[in-house]
Amino acid sequence: MSTDKNALAISLFSEVLAADQMVRNRLSRVLPKGMEISHFSVLNHLAWHEGERTPAQLAETFNVTRGAMTNTLNRLEWAGYIHIRPDWDDARRKMVAISPAGLRARDQALSSIAPMVGEVIDKLGEDRVRSTLPILRQLRDQLSSKPKPD
């Protein structure tokens, strides 16, 4: 990689990582007491994607280990935010669905983060945010794609 390209890559990832850290910090402060970012992320995903998901599907979606997802799901189940049931077709698998309490918790979390997100969008401008989203999606897609074998 050329020196200019290397500097560009370092700048890009430095900005992405710094923004990620700041977003996580601000979200953690405004989420309802006891709710972690991982909890909100899973609840939001389940609310958007109707139907059930397996823990393995959720782990893959969030790019975490199955153990980490199991820990998050156990906490959400304990709080009454999700239902976990056996898969009737394959007893080795479980199925996860959001509960009515989980929908309410997710809605409360959205209400608590909306002012913070709205402020950021207002300062940056809606058009600039919209024009940035496709680039961020492409970056995410590039980073999530599996490396091709040699």
Spans of features found by a protein language model:
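N-terminal positioning helix adjacent to the helix-turn-helix/winged-helix DNA-binding module
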Residues: 8, 23, 38-39, 101, ...
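Charged, amphipathic alpha-helical coiled-coil/dimerization segments
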Residues: 74-134
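N-terminal helix-turn-helix DNA-binding core of bacterial DNA-binding proteins
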Residues: 25-65
